Curated annotation (Swiss-Prot):
Family membership: Belongs to the UPF0434 family.
InterPro entries linked: Trm112-like
Any GO CC annotation of this UniProt entry: cytosol
Lineage of the organism: Bacteria, Pseudomonadati, Pseudomonadota, Gammaproteobacteria, Alteromonadales
The protein, known as: UPF0434 protein MADE_1009415
Source organism superkingdom: Bacteria
Length: 64
């Protein structure tokens, strides 16, 4: 099941409540402010802070 991009309009980072962006290969939602990546499993984003991956500044910059 693919991630529905329309969800980006209503989903927010669970940490800062900011905007999330879809990464290039459409496997993660990224919060650029907190530098966290949330996996998408079977089309469903896993928006749990303890399951998120911390990103470097270079990795965050690559998600434009």
């Amino acid at each position: 099941m693919a991630f529905d991009k329309k969800l980006l309009e209503v989903l927010a980072c669970p940490v800062c409540k900011g905007k999330l962006v879809l990464n290039e290969d459409m496997t993660q939602l990224v919060c650029r402010f907190d530098r966290l990546a949330f996996d998408i499993k079977d089309g469903i984003p896993v928006l749990i802070e303890s399951k998120a991956t911390a990103l470097s500044l270079d990795e965050v910059d690559a998600t434009r």
